[in-house]
Structures are given as structure tokens and as C-alpha cells.
Amino acid sequence: MKEGFAGLRGVALVVCASLVAGCVAPAISATSGLNGIEHILVIYAENRSFDHLYGLFPGANGIANASPRLYLQVDRDGRELATLPAVWRGKNPDPAFPAGLPNKPFRIDAPPINLPLSAPTRDAVHRFYQNLEQINGGRNDRFVAASDAGGLVMGYYDGSALPLWQWAKDYVLADNFFMAAFGGSYLNHFWLVCACTPEDHDAPAELRAQLDE
């Protein structure tokens, strides 16, 4: 579960995304093979990790495959956290989440929290440098430490009531889809389509990033 809602290292490095791909109207042609496909739709779920919504999907590489080696989070100095930090709502702890949650994934829509999918929660940070720190060389153990939402990044839902869940059953669910670029989904949209980073060589000076060396 990684990215905006991050969490399980190794299990879902889908930092920023779950992917559902399917062929529209799969029975429209008797032609076999690729020639029988008229359209392919890709649903790229922005700012979501795989486990955040699909961690309980039957047969998927999700929560059931998690082990402490894969999900335990550390602080910025590399020390294992005894418990998850508070879940933040603005500048204060969110009263909907109890303090001292165990250092592991937790259900948001189950006791003791019981927040439904319809309840808004904080949009966790999903920027380039924070994401680089969160992934931590592939260990994926600093999503909590480098988050502005505290322990929320380890939360997940039972997504079976969502229409997306049924679409995943009807078509294809990519449970080992990995993002191509650090940060949010906008840049990853380009990488999904063209495996490239867009550049504006004619951008005015005030819009160009200046590197301090």
C-alpha cells in the first residue's frame, strides 16, 4: 500500500496506484486474439495504494501476504516504531483514530475505528522527495515517518462494496503494478502512456526550477 495512502512495503509498492484494465464489451466479436479487442480501458486510481482498496481482494497479492519484514515502519533514524504515530487531521490528532495503533496495517472501516468508505480522511503527501524518502531504497519502511498524515498511511478498507471491485472481478486487476516515477500520479500518467517525462523547453525563466549546488 504505498503512495498517497501508503503502507505495506514490498507487498504493495503500488505507491500511488491501483490499476484495473479491461476490454470493453469482450464478446462483441468472434475474432480471436488481439484483433477481437476494440477498446482497452485503463483505470488508474490516483493517490491510492493497491492495498488501500484491494488488499482483501480474493487471490490478490495483498494484506494476507504481508509479514513484519514487509510492513514494519521505522523513524527517520531507522529505528523501528513501537506503535504508529497519531493520525493527523490538520494540525491536531484525528479523534476518530485511537492513539498507539500497532505498527502494522489496520482496517479503517472495522472496530475500533469504524469509518466507512464515504467518510473523508486526510490526503496523505505524495510528492517527489517525500516519496523518495518513503521508499527508502526499496525497503518501503518510511511511509509513516515521511508522511503528513501520521499512521493513516497504514490504513486500508474492505473495498468489496465499491463498483471498482466488481470491475476488477469482471476484467483484470493488476496487483503487481509498480509506478514508474516518484511522487504523485500526474507524472506517472505520462509514464504509463509514453514512458517519458514531459519537458517544456520554451518555459519562461520564472517557471524553471533552479538547482542549488
PLM regions and their residue ranges:
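N-terminal pro-sequences and low-complexity stem/linker regions of secreted or lumenal proteins
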Residues: V24-E213
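Bacterial N-terminal signal peptides
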Residues: G10-G22
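Bacterial N-terminal signal peptides that target proteins for export
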Residues: M1-A12
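A general, composition-driven signal for non-globular sequence regions
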Residues: E3, V20, S32-G33
